[in-house]
C-alpha cells in the first residue's frame, strides 16, 4: 500500500475554489479540497500529511 501524496508545490494560494473533493489530513481534520488542504500543509511547515482521500 503506497503512501498517498498530493502535489502542493503551487501553494499557498490566496483563495480556494469551493469544490467538494474532501481529503482527510493527518490532524484528523477533513479539508474541503486539495487547495484548502495544501494551504494547511504550507501553514504547518510540511508537518501535515494526507491520511486518505474522503472525509475523516
UniProtKB/Swiss-Prot annotation:
Residue ranges of domain Kazal-like in the record: 6-56
Marked site (Reactive bond 3) residue numbers: 18-19
Gene Ontology MF, one: serine-type endopeptidase inhibitor activity
Coiled-coil boundaries: none
Keyword field contains ATP-binding: no
Matches recorded under Pfam families: Kazal_1
Residues annotated as glycosylated: 45
Cellular component GO terms, alphabetical: extracellular region
UniProt entry tagged with the keyword Glycoprotein: yes
Highest taxon of the lineage: Eukaryota
SMART domains: KAZAL
Subcellular localization, as worded in the UniProt entry: Secreted
Disulphide connectivity of cysteines: 8-38, 16-35, 24-56
Swiss-Prot/TrEMBL keywords: Disulfide bond, Glycoprotein, Protease inhibitor, Repeat, Secreted, Serine protease inhibitor
Domain notes: Avian ovomucoid consists of three homologous, tandem Kazal family inhibitory domains.
Name of the protein in question: Ovomucoid
Species: Penelope jacquacu (Spix's guan)
Phylogenetic classification of the source organism: Eukaryota, Metazoa, Chordata, Craniata, Vertebrata
Amino acid at each position: 500500500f503506497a503512501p498517498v501524496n498530493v502535489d502542493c508545490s503551487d501553494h499557498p494560494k490566496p483563495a480556494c475554489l469551493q469544490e467538494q473533493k474532501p481529503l482527510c489530513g493527518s490532524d484528523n481534520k477533513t479539508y474541503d479540497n486539495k487547495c484548502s488542504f495544501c494551504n494547511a500543509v504550507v501553514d504547518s511547515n510540511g508537518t501535515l500529511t494526507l491520511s486518505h482521500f474522503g472525509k475523516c
